[in-house]
Regions:
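N-terminal membrane-anchoring/stem segments of glycan-assembly enzymes
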Residues: 1-61, 376-379, 408-419, 447-456
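Cell-envelope/extracellular polymer assembly enzymes that use nucleotide-activated donors
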Residues: 63-66, 94, 256
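Short, acidic, metal-binding catalytic loop of nucleotide-sugar glycosyltransferases
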Residues: 83-92
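A conserved acidic beta->alpha catalytic loop
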Residues: 99-108, 123-128, 165
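Long helical/loop segments within the catalytic core of UDP-sugar-dependent glycosyltransferases
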Residues: 124-125, 129-148, 152-154, 168-250, ...
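The conserved acidic donor/metal-binding loop of glycosyltransferases
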Residues: 161-165, 261
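Catalytic donor-sugar/metal-binding loop of nucleotide-sugar-dependent glycosyltransferases
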Residues: 258-276
């Protein structure tokens, strides 16, 4: 709808103060949409190219890979996750399960792995339940004390969620990813296990696939890859560059870590050759709670702007600044969504009253809103067609994905309210137990923790 048409329906004169404000808002909205579309197009094109490589590779000295798995009441899922890791025949792999003061049998279930590569660390009050970052920092202190005979550049610290299932070849792929000396961190892809039985889980899977296939792959080109909380691998020497306790108390300590690593001169790499599989949230209420926490954590990253502007260069700096400012852009975008809904209502009223108007704007709005989604549909279909997804169904999912993408308009403002009122404490999101895991967790476990369990100090 043109600004003249809007003025006709609202009774505003184009030369009145409100009319001028209306036009400024209209063109401002178009400008924001144009910037978002150009950014998406740039990342889409960048993601199709090969990553930049410049540094020499390490010699064939072995890497020690230590997987840290922070857990709080994860008895339902931790057993299967540990078994999946111990099934990988890699003598240079170690698994450290961090029981962060659980009330259930998390430690006992993990300790039943029966593999000498598995260690259970128990955190007790008052050191327990201080956040994922604090749990990781305490575990890292143990890793450092145990690996003094190995150069820190040859020690890789991985982070996995308790419900994570790494691809069988993921550890060997991690070794390949860290061959270049400049690589300080590697993030693998994320897939949602239960996407076949839940539409909400399907949207989360599509979200992760689009994010990794377009934006993470594109960021390989500009050296601004972000880190996630699952299947994150970091060189110990890169963590050392961030100090003795590299993970912060941010609600999104993974995002925070990735930003700060990019500012140290190390290269963050995205590795698409393998992925971690996790359970998606199937309850809208729990999803909104989870995403509110993530959004609030991203809001807390604003203090990193100065370091990024000072330490990074070129397109990498520009994109990292974009990542930090994204939640604020989404909040502004939510106002555009509200404005569009008001415009739709105005147009509907005009149609009922038989006012003359052009509907060409509606076609343009559809192209702007759903055009990128059709590209996403093709990308997602290409990834999922081996699992029986047809192209028409992918297009249908892409339209639902646009509506799913409106959720930040709701939970974003909730996150702002929590941040402004100083509410930063969160209970973890309940896991979605798989049937096989639920059966196993019901089995009797020993009441005492085997000797393999190590208390954190």
């Amino acid at each position: 709808m043109s600004t003249q048409a809007l003025s006709l329906h609202t009774g505003l004169s184009p030369l009145s103060p409100l009319g001028v404000l209306d036009r400024v808002g209209w063109w401002g909205a178009l400008g924001m949409i144009a910037v978002a579309l150009v950014y998406t197009l740039f990342m889409l094109l960048a993601s199709r190219g090969a990553p930049r490589r410049s540094g020499p590779s390490h010699p064939d000295a072995p890497l020690l890979i230590v997987i840290l798995m922070p857990c709080l009441n994860e008895a339902e899922v931790i057993g299967a996750s540990v078994r999946r890791l111990t099934s990988i025949p890699d003598p240079g792999l170690r698994i450290m399960v961090i029981d962060d003061g659980s009330d259930d049998d998390t430690a006992q279930v993990a300790a039943q792995a029966g593999d000498e590569r598995v260690e259970v660390v128990r955190r007790r009050p008052p050191r327990a339940r201080l956040g994922k970052g604090e749990a990781l920092n305490d575990a890292l202190s143990i890793v450092r004390s145990r690996s003094t005979s190995v150069p820190s550049s040859r020690v890789i610290v991985g982070v996995m969620d308790a419900d994570g299932r790494l691809d069988p070849h993921a550890i060997s792929e991690a070794r390949r990813a860290f061959a270049p000396q400049e690589v300080g961190a590697v993030q693998m892809g994320v897939r949602i296990n239960n996407r076949f039985g839940s539409l909400l889980a399907r949207m989360q899977d599509m979200e992760f696939v689009i994010f990794t296939e377009v934006f993470q792959r594109g960021r390989r080109r500009v050296r601004s890859v972000g880190m996630g909380g699952n299947a994150q691998f970091v060189r110990l020497s890169a963590l050392d560059a961030l100090g003795p306790r590299p993970w912060t108390r941010s609600l999104t300590e993974d995002f925070d870590l990735g930003i700060r690593l990019n500012a140290t001169g190390w290269t963050n790499e995205f590795w698409s050759a393998s992925a971690v599989h996790q359970q998606g949230v199937t309850s809208m209420r729990r999803l909104m709670r989870q995403r509110t926490r993530w959004f609030q954590g991203n809001l807390q990253a604003l203090h990193l702007l100065r370091a990024v502007a000072r330490e990074q260069r070129g397109l990498g700096r520009a994109d990292t600044l974009w990542q930090i400012l994204t939640p604020y852009l989404l909040l502004t975008g939510s106002l555009l969504t509200l404005s569009f809904l008001i415009t739709m209502v105005t147009a509907a009223v005009a149609a009922v009253l038989r006012w003359e108007q052009s509907w060409a704007w509606l076609v343009g709005a559809y192209v702007i809103a759903f055009g990128p989604a059709l590209v996403y549909a093709w990308i997602y279909w290409r990834i999922e067609r081996g699992n029986g997804l047809g192209p028409l169904k992918a297009v249908g999912y892409s339209h639902l994905f646009v509506l799913y993408g409106l959720l930040p308009s709701v939970y974003g403002w909730r996150a702002v309210a929590r941040e402004l009122t100083g509410r930063t404490g969160w209970a973890k999101t309940a896991r979605e137990a798989e049937p096989a895991q639920a059966t196993e967790s019901a089995r009797s476990v020993s009441a005492t923790v085997p000797p393999a369990t190590h208390p954190a100090t």
